[in-house]
Amino acid sequence: MTQLSSNDVPSMGRRQFMNLLTFGTATGVALGALYPVANYFMPLRAGGGGGGTSAKDELGNPVTKTGWLANHQAGDRSLVQGLKGDPTYLIVNSEGDIGEFGLNAICTHLGCVVPWDSGANKFICPCHGSQYDTNGKVVRGPAPLSLALAHVDVDDDAVLVKQWSETDFRTNENPWWA
């Protein structure tokens, strides 16, 4: 095999080295800046094999079915962190079990968090007075749409929140949030 002499091998000059160093640094910074953007559009899924997001309490701890039901009675609607960290109501049904659906607590009018008013037995938005029934269906505006639904599943005592993409059972229409 023939060996190349040192005169045949091109050397990297100072200018080429500085260009390579600048390009490498700029590429590293750009990729570092793209990571949070990519994470926003494709978030890592927390939770069990079913693919849901683990519901979290106000301290960020995962919610368990036994722990939740020990502190909440039938008819309670209480907030957890659900999909994308949005406030989501977990509903304890009349049988004293966690309901099969949860409600995103963000008002469809201007994005305020809608509290549950147990005295009035409905959700009432503090910003402009929109009202939603016990299932999150809008009953009084100015909110144009019902609260978004989410599936709630229990996997090994862990409460999971999943995207709702089926027909909205309250309106018999396709979900506006999917």
Swiss-Prot record:
It is a single-pass membrane protein. GO terms for molecular function: 2 iron, 2 sulfur cluster binding; electron transporter, transferring electrons within cytochrome b6/f complex of photosystem II activity; metal ion binding; monooxygenase activity; oxidoreductase activity, acting on paired donors, with incorporation or reduction of molecular oxygen; plastoquinol--plastocyanin reductase activity. The gene is petC. InterPro entries: Cyt_b6_f_Rieske, Rieske_2Fe-2S, Rieske_2Fe-2S_sf, Rieske_Fe-S_prot, Rieske_Fe-S_prot_C, TAT_signal. Its cofactor is [2Fe-2S] cluster. It comes from Prochlorococcus marinus (strain MIT 9515). Its main location: membrane. It catalyses: 2 oxidized [plastocyanin] + a plastoquinol + 2 H(+)(in) = 2 reduced [plastocyanin] + a plastoquinone + 4 H(+)(out). Disulfide bonds join C112-C127. HAMAP family: Cytb6_f_Rieske. This is Cytochrome b6-f complex iron-sulfur subunit. Pfam families: Rieske (PF00355), TM_PetC (PF25471). One of its GO terms (cellular component) is plasma membrane-derived thylakoid membrane. [2Fe-2S] cluster binds at C107, H109, C125, H128.
